[in-house]
Regions:
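A short glycine-rich beta-alpha junction/loop motif
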Residues: 88-94, 126-152
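Sequence-specific dsDNA recognition surfaces
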Residues: 7-20, 34-62
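Ligand-binding loop in jelly-roll beta-barrel domains
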Residues: 99-104
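Short, ligand-facing micro-motifs at secondary-structure edges
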Residues: 37-50, 65-91, 106-110, 119-123
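Non-catalytic DNA-recognition/assembly elements of restriction-modification systems
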Residues: 1-15, 140, 148
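Extracellular/lumenal glycan-associated surfaces
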Residues: 2, 152-164, 168
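Short, recurring structural edge motifs at helix starts
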Residues: 17-18, 52, 128-130, 139-146, ...
């Protein structure tokens, strides 16, 4: 496994200013940061919220992960979702991380949402009533990763487990 700082293997952006008030019956698909606290998805390949398109919107490429920029606690904010579909508008209050090809988005999302990386991410959160995390905080996180083939196998395994859990919860 290789160990690198996230800032060495990824670039960063911020979601655009969409909020819950912008939700419409139809329009462009929209991912809002609140979904991370209601759906708890590590892999996002579809959304059920829509908004009217507007200039300056940041759309997913299908290869990024999102990390909330704010939350109620350090533990809440220490999570990530891989956006695996192109063309989803990324709403406000999201840190958007574009990993280089040496790291798969799904593997990185699982890594940041669990274990020692999640603990380190929680430690970076700042604030009392509302905690925040910025791209500059994310850049310094140490990330360990195997080769891409193994990352894909790990991501597929955990994604299959998530799907199975979701299926059983619906019963």
């Amino acid at each position: 496994w290789e160990q690198r700082k996230l800032g060495e293997i990824a670039s960063f952006s911020k979601g655009s200013g969409y909020s819950k008030a912008d939700i419409r019956e139809s329009g462009i698909p929209l991912f809002l940061y609140g979904r991370m606290y209601t759906q708890y998805e590590t892999r996002v390949d579809s959304v059920d919220t829509f908004a009217a398109p507007r200039p300056g919107t940041l759309y997913s490429k299908g290869t990024e992960i999102v990390v909330p920029a704010s939350g109620e606690s350090a533990e809440d904010i220490a999570r990530a979702s891989a956006i695996t579909r192109e063309g989803i508008a990324l709403g406000g209050d999201l840190n958007v991380v574009y990993p280089q090809r040496m790291v798969t988005p799904l593997f990185l999302a699982y890594g940041l949402s669990h274990g020692s990386s999640q603990e380190l991410l929680a430690q970076k959160a700042q604030g009392k009533t509302v905690v925040h995390i910025h791209a500059s905080d994310l850049k310094g996180l140490g990330i360990a990763f195997p080769d891409v083939t193994e990352q894909q196998a790990i991501g597929t395994f955990f994604s299959s487990l998530d799907d199975l859990i979701t299926l059983h919860q619906r019963k």
